[in-house]
Each structure stands twice: as C-alpha cells, then as structure tokens.
C-alpha cells in the first residue's frame, strides 16, 4: 500500500510539473523584428526593441556562409524583410523572406548563376509535425529556417508582412 501511495504521489507530481513546462507562452501579435543567429541555431523575435521569445531552429543542410546560388543549401545572411505568408505550405505554414535582394541577384548574375529564392521560416513537412523538436538533431532544409509546427503557428499569427529579419553568421 505504501508503494502505491508513493507511485500515485510521483505521478501527480510529474503531471503538475508537466503542466507548468508545457504551458505555451503567449506572444503579442506584433513581431516587428526577427533575429537569426545561425551559429547558435536560435531565432529571436522582438516587438520594437523588446525581446519576446527565443526559438531553437534548423537551417539549410550547408549552413556555413551566405547563400549565393540556387541549390547551395545555405541560409542567407544579412538584412531582409518578411514578404509573404502562406497558410497552405508543404511545411505546415510559412513566412517568406525577401531573399534575394538586389545585391544577391547582381552577385549571382555576375557568376552566371541564379541566386535562388523561396527562402522561408516554416514548420515541419506536412504530416511530420509529431516529430517536434527532434528536427533539431541536424540541419535539413534547402536553406530555410525551420521550427516546430506549434512554433510557426504562434510566429505566423504575430508577424506582419514587412517585419524586418536580420540573419547573422
């Protein structure tokens, strides 16, 4: 009987602990700035100068260096803007990033190549959302920034087209 009471107490304690850990932080619906730190694999979202929340991310399969050409599997570096929102993406939902800019296009053209495009902040591939944070085990995108489906839901809802995004090394 004593063991049963201890087991029940442990289960209740774990349930309470889990409920505190799993509560979602509510973020205001006004993300004005996104900062991506590629080397740390984190993305910070801001309202003006106030940090709202930090997310762990996965990047392109070859994350070192600035994206220069279509198919190089790199994630861009520099200052861009959110230029689109797609709730029907192949990756749950996505926010478009304004890569390539004029400078990116000119560099690629000078080399006789395409700069590429379609760089996004997105969730997991449709039907794979249950893997959650396991996607962080390695960089797997074609140059995009990936978060969990739950995370893209809150980022998507709080970000307007035109928000600034700065991608650092």
Summary of predicted features, one role per range:
Residues 2-3, 12-26:
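Bacterial Sec-dependent signal peptides at the C-terminal "C-region" and cleavage site
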Residues 33, 54-56, 79, 118, ...:
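Well-ordered beta-strand positions in beta-sheet-rich domains
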Residues 25-63:
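A structural motif detector for short, solvent-exposed N-terminal "entry" segments of globular domains
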Residues 44-46, 53-54, 64-67, 90-92, ...:
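Short, solvent-exposed loop/turn elements at domain surfaces
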Residues 22-32, 59-83, 102-107, 149-150:
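N-terminal post-signal-peptidase region of extra-cytosolic proteins
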Residues 84-169:
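Exported/periplasmic cell-wall-interacting domains
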Residues 31, 52, 77, 90-92, ...:
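Sequence-level motif detector for i,i+2 pairs with an aromatic at +2
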């Amino acid at each position: 009987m004593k063991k049963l009471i201890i087991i029940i107490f442990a289960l209740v304690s774990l349930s309470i602990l889990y409920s505190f850990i799993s509560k979602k932080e509510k973020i205001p619906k006004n993300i004005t700035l996104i900062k991506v730190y590629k080397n740390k694999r984190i993305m910070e979202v801001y309202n003006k100068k106030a940090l709202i929340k930090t997310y762990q991310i996965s990047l392109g399969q070859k994350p070192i260096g600035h994206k220069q050409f279509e198919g190089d599997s790199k994630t861009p570096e520099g200052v861009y803007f959110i230029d689109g929102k797609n709730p029907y993406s192949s990756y749950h939902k996505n926010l478009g990033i304004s890569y390539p800019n004029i400078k990116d296009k000119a560099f690629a053209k000078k080399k006789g190549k395409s700069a590429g495009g379609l760089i996004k902040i997105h969730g997991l591939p449709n039907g794979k959302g249950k893997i959650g944070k396991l996607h962080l085990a390695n960089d797997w995108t074609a140059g995009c920034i990936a978060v969990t489906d739950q995370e893209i839901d809150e980022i998507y809802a709080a970000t307007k087209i035109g928000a600034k995004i700065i991608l650092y090394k």
